[in-house]
A protein has these predicted regions:
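Acidic/polar N-terminal loop/beta-strand segments that form early-domain functional surfaces
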Residues: 3-5, 40-42, 452
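Outer-membrane beta-barrel proteins
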Residues: 3-21, 75-82, 137-140, 212-214, ...
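A conserved hydrophobic secondary-structure block that centers on an alpha-helix together
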Residues: 7-9, 19, 26-29, 124-128
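A short acidic (Asp/Glu
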Residues: 10-12, 49-52, 219-222, 374
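A subset of solvent-exposed loop/turn segments in beta-rich extracellular surface proteins, enriched
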Residues: 16-17, 48, 52-80, 109-138, ...
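Outer membrane beta-barrel
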Residues: 17-111, 229-248, 392-406
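Exposed, low-structure sequence patches enriched in small/polar residues
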Residues: 21-25, 84, 140-177, 183-485
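Aromatic- and glycine-enriched pocket-lining scaffold segments that form the walls
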Residues: 83-132, 140-142, 146-150
Length: 485
């Protein structure tokens, strides 16, 4: 995997090998007792992610179906994401029947902003941008080492696991504690975390949980149950408590605040199919943040709910979805005094899809309404077409969007290269287009090419600051070649 962001030097400066980012790896599976061997750049996920997960985390909609059934172990890092991966070697071995042991070692350079007074790390950067002289100075100017492992026992639908790791930096982490929300950020040079996870799965029920701690002495725990009442009704409940004192630099799990820290919450979901052609999905999520967050100088709360209905017959389906979300954010009164304001966001989506072996068609409409002091409104209409024949697949999409500002932005999903999710955020007025072609030459050789672009009607410039592009229609290109042997 090779990646180049707009504005980054190509075969110039520090990029003497051309691309700013490359991700070499080798992944071997099922080699005798060795279930997985990862060399180069790889990812790891164990338990429910409270200790170690630099792979992905479930969204709230996906939790209705996937809770308790997420994958675990070591994976190749084959995405364009430049911040979340390990570099070195990792292996999973079946030592005895039903007992797997995983060990991993990693050392890599990281991007960081450095405090000039004591040469410590103020912030670890994960954007991967190296476009200006300042950003180049922050490129790989610190290092991180990780050593850890996992023990996993499984039998008759039950499993129990223990995960632990230690990480260290060549420079200590000293975040800017003059900012209230950073008072609970990790501080120091060496950190460790350990956790235990459990699960029981049967045909109708899955129960999962994990509890973790670390050198901060804070506690994090998450517990879930997915119960299939009958063939037509499934219920999901997730409880989470992440102390504001807890942190793990390698964690990622189910959360509202995008962090396994400073959050308590309850999620309730249901999936109901009263008749064969009709399915209803619902979830409600309440979250509480005891410590001030970014852009919120006091305790805050969030409420999020979504309702959707899908009607399907043969190769046709129609889905209607409504989502309501409210949360707190700092505002200022006429005297410049801060207070917590309440923000409300509504999102509506309607899709009509035809999907068979040869043809894929989808028409989609989106509406977004954001309210703080005043309303911000946006909408989008989109058409996708896909053709699948023999070993070739081709997909195109065309969308027109019009929003008042970034707050009422809309999202569209585009098929892209493997391991790379593409959900561009669209705002202002314009047209988004994309085309993707995939060719499977054999069971071992596959190639994907994607071209996408956004034509802005309301502006001659895309983005702002260092990300500003003086064109109405920037183009992005993705190429991927995979050879398995």
């Amino acid at each position: 995997m090779m990646s180049q962001d707009a504005g980054e030097p190509f075969f110039a400066g520090k990029n003497k090998w051309g691309y700013d980012y490359m991700s070499p790896y080798m992944l071997i599976k099922d080699l005798g007792k060795v279930k997985t061997l990862a060399i180069g750049r790889y990812k790891a996920r164990f338990g429910m992610g409270l200790v170690m997960n630099n792979s992905f985390s479930m969204g709230k909609q996906a939790s209705l179906a996937s809770i308790g059934r997420v994958s675990r172990g070591l994976y190749a890092h084959a995405s364009r994401q430049e911040g979340n991966y390990m570099q070195g070697i990792g292996a999973t071995v079946e030592t005895i029947h039903n007992l797997d042991v995983t060990g991993f070692l990693s050392y890599r350079k990281i991007d960081a902003t450095i405090n000039s007074d004591d040469n410590s790390i103020s912030t670890i950067l994960k954007t991967g941008y190296h476009r200006s002289a300042t950003e180049m100075l922050r490129r790989r100017n610190a290092s991180q080492a990780i050593m850890g492992g996992n023990v996993y026992y499984h039998v008759n639908g039950f499993h129990f696991g223990i995960t632990g790791y230690q990480t260290s930096f060549d420079k200590p982490l000293h975040p800017d504690t003059t900012k209230l929300y950073k008072l609970i950020a990790p501080w120091g040079k060496r950190f460790w975390n350990i956790g235990a996870d459990y699960a029981y799965m049967s045909r109708r029920i899955s129960i999962n949980g994990e509890v973790a701690t670390g050198n901060s002495k804070g506690i994090a725990t998450i517990n879930s149950i997915n119960y299939m009442v009958n063939s037509n009704l499934t219920l999901v409940a997730i409880q989470r408590f992440y102390s504001y004192k807890y942190y793990s630099l390698m964690a990622s799990s189910f959360s509202e605040g995008r962090s396994v820290q400073n959050e308590s919450g309850v999620y309730l979901g249901a999936k109901w199919q009263p008749i064969y052609q009709l399915t209803f999905s619902h979830y409600f999520d309440w979250a509480y943040f005891p410590w001030p967050k970014y852009l919120a100088t006091a305790t805050t709360r969030t409420f999020d709910m979504q309702h959707s209905a899908t009607w399907s017959k043969n190769t046709w389906s129609i889905t209607a979805r409504y989502r309501l979300k409210t949360w707190n954010k700092d505002s200022k009164d006429d005297n410049d005094n801060k207070f917590l304001d309440r923000i409300t966001q509504h999102r509506i989506r309607l899709t009509i899809t035809k999907d068979n072996k040869l043809l894929f068609l989808r028409t989609q409409g989106d509406i977004s309404l954001y309210h703080k002091d005043e309303n911000s409104f946006g909408y989008m209409v989109m058409q996708q077409v896909g053709i699948r024949k023999n070993k070739m697949q081709a997909y195109t999409s065309l969308a027109y969007f019009n929003t008042d500002d970034y707050n009422s932005r809309v999202y569209t999903y585009e098929r892209s290269t493997l391991y790379n999710l593409s959900f561009p955020a669209l705002y202002g007025e314009g047209i988004r287009f994309a085309a993707t072609i995939r060719a499977d030459f054999s069971s071992n050789l596959m190639a994907i090419a994607k071209v996408g672009g956004t034509h802005r009607i309301d502006n001659n410039k895309i983005g702002s600051g260092l990300q500003a592009i003086d064109t109405k229609t920037p183009i992005d290109v993705d190429l991927q070649l995979r050879w398995k042997f």
